[in-house]
């Protein structure tokens, strides 16, 4: 795509109002990508997860007038053909962990996958680039600390612990978010973006 390194007018803005999510992203990215965080009220869209993510990135880029990274997370139950999917946040708010388990009560298949989509838009009017991470697992009765979304009910394949029970370092290594951010990191390393310094200390 490009030979010369792209100079970004300012650090990438990661759009989130979720402190736990921000903490996790900071832990995974470290200092590899200069970014700041900002809570924006973007309309909640419906559609395919990747399309939703791209559209949110476009809207955010025009609001901040610069490069943005937005994230969308889905929890997809195979027995329900991928639902709740991108609507997991509302399902969780309305019916809680027990309700999520009850959705699968009539089904033998408790398998699910967690999916994370990051969309990077380098500025207003730029086509967003998406990075997708997936982790397969199953839905179980809630176990572990109850302070981060649906982590207590998702047990990744190959592990005896739910996301909530795992040490953060282990979760970040294998999670849908960790996998998507590894691709974001890779992209930044190969694209050689540099952030324009304005010399204001």
Curated annotation (Swiss-Prot):
| Family label | Belongs to the HAM1 NTPase family.
GO biological process per UniProt = deoxyribonucleoside triphosphate catabolic process; nucleoside triphosphate catabolic process; nucleotide metabolic process
Q: How does it assemble?
A: Homodimer.
Q: Which compartments is it annotated to reside in?
A: Cytoplasm
Give the source's domain of life in one word. Eukaryota
Recorded GO terms, molecular function?
Answer: dITP diphosphatase activity; ITP diphosphatase activity; metal ion binding; nucleoside triphosphate diphosphatase activity; nucleotide binding; XTP diphosphatase activity
Would the keyword Nucleotide-binding be found if you checked this record's keyword annotation?
yes
Look up the EC number in the record and give it. 3.6.1.66
- Summarize the protein's role: Pyrophosphatase that hydrolyzes non-canonical purine nucleotides such as inosine triphosphate (ITP), deoxyinosine triphosphate (dITP) or xanthosine 5'-triphosphate (XTP) to their respective monophosphate derivatives. The enzyme does not distinguish between the deoxy- and ribose forms. Probably excludes non-canonical purines from RNA and DNA precursor pools, thus preventing their incorporation into RNA and DNA and avoiding chromosomal lesions.
Keyword Nuclease belongs to the record: no
Instruction: Output the SUPFAM superfamilies linked to this UniProt entry.
Output: ITPase-like
Designated name of the protein: Inosine triphosphate pyrophosphatase
Indicate the enzyme's highest-level EC class.
hydrolase
The record's listing under InterPro entries reads: ITPase (IPR027502), ITPase-like_fam (IPR029001), RdgB/HAM1 (IPR002637)
- Residues where ITP binds: 16-21, 56, 72-73, 89, 148-151, 171, 176-177
Which UniProt keyword terms apply here?
Answer: Cytoplasm, Hydrolase, Magnesium, Manganese, Metal-binding, Nucleotide metabolism, Nucleotide-binding
Co-factor binding comment: Binds 1 divalent metal cation per subunit; can use either Mg(2+) or Mn(2+).
Q: What is the scientific name of the source organism?
A: Sorghum bicolor
Where is it mostly found? cytoplasm
Q: What residues does Mg(2+) bind to?
A: 44
